[in-house]
């Protein structure tokens, strides 16, 4: 087992341990309906923390190209609204930029960002020693599943200014 596999298993185990705490609080709540928003927020915060950890694991797995690349993982949908539930997938959009103080050709930047994003998806969603956390959905990105997995901020802005429908603009 390589170090990223060990880190992935550790992340998944830690996630499930914290999820069990949320479940226990949920099941013992005197008024479960009053508790729904709290559960959604806590689960979304846990997913955000898992994405942060998965990003670190992914960056390490990608290696040197990741050093010059900053990748933002933007939570969308129920995760972004802090309304995650027990059966939700996690919607994300990726924005890539050169790491601070670095100058990277856009083609290399996009390749490194895509490698990191692909590895991040494997960390949270692929089969392994520990079960996956949840499906990671990148379909809310510009042009949906037909669009680039990773874009620069300028590319996102240009898309939304030119092509986005009103419902997509309201998401941003």
Residue ranges with predicted function:
Residues 4-172:
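A nucleotide- and high-energy phosphate-metabolite-utilizing enzyme signature
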